[in-house]
Amino acid sequence: MKPLLSVVIAGVCAATLHTGAVQADEVKVAVAANFKGTIERIGKEFTAKTGHTLAISSAATGVLYTQISHGAPFDLFLSADAATPEKLEKEGKGSDRFTYAIGQLGLWKKGGPAPDEATLRRWKGNLAIANARTAPYGAAAMATLTHLKIDPKQYRLLTGANIGQTWQFVDTGNAELGFVAWANLVEAGKTAEAWAVPADFYPPIEQQGLVLKKGAAVEALVAWLKGPGQAQIKAAGYALPQ
């Protein structure tokens, strides 16, 4: 009987693995520009563990809102704020809203020395900033200037469509100074060239997710972001939700 039992168990295991492979699916993720690199890294481990793959589309939060409102076929929205997912949820576009990270703002001067508040106050040159109307990190940057009672007109502002483009402005030398996502600085190993803007200078950048289309693969990814993925999110330069 033992050989027969072994064959039966082996057959059940093989069937389970085969079923898992068939059920593996692709999750279409709309992600805010600041979180693109992080979700790509998380996605590799998630795929290795679950078999589910990610199809990632990245843009400014406001741009993604417009796309989702017009029926873009995404399964999950990872926003750079809380207001946009909340608005979409009220409009009946999604459900199961959750906070996955708290964003942090940085002021970057490529090549250093690291800037600080005094640098920002005396600066008269180019300053890169994301569009405050569509990019939450841009809104946080403008809130920082308001908090410090600095008139933005003292700078030559270069406005990026999203925080990724703002990074490019500084990285290419088009702007000597720029507000960027701290996570992007961590990813590039550039934190020594930047100032971590104090969190009380701007409203919390509470980054929320919204399920747009329910399914097993989407549920698995959400669970991963709330669980094993939190370590990677913290390592990427974000604060974690309480």
Residue map of PLM features:
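Exported/periplasmic ABC-transporter solute-binding proteins
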Residues: 25-49, 55-58, 62, 66-70, ...
